[in-house]
Amino acid sequence: MPGVKVKEAEPFELALKKFKKQCEKAGILSEVRKREHYEKPSIKKKKKAIAARKRAMKKQRKMMD
């Protein structure tokens, strides 16, 4: 769980920025978006296969250069 200790002279905006950065690193926002709506297992499997194909194509293009 991200947490930020705010110093006396530190502006709120800076503390908020630090908190947002920690949340992003922890993957909280992506997890919330992923859990927002139910996704059928078959669709999850399809997305995973598509992502694997994209990674393979990208790796292959990188090897060609």
Swiss-Prot record:
The keyword Ribosomal protein applies. GO terms for cellular component: ribonucleoprotein complex; ribosome. Pfam families: Ribosomal_S21 (PF01165). Keywords: Ribonucleoprotein, Ribosomal protein. Transmembrane segments: none annotated. GO terms for molecular function: structural constituent of ribosome. GO terms for biological process: translation. Gene3D superfamilies: Ribosomal protein S8. Belongs to the bacterial ribosomal protein bS21 family. NCBIfam families: S21p. This is Small ribosomal subunit protein bS21. It comes from Geobacter metallireducens (strain ATCC 53774 / DSM 7210 / GS-15). The lineage of its organism: Bacteria, Pseudomonadati, Thermodesulfobacteriota, Desulfuromonadia, Geobacterales.
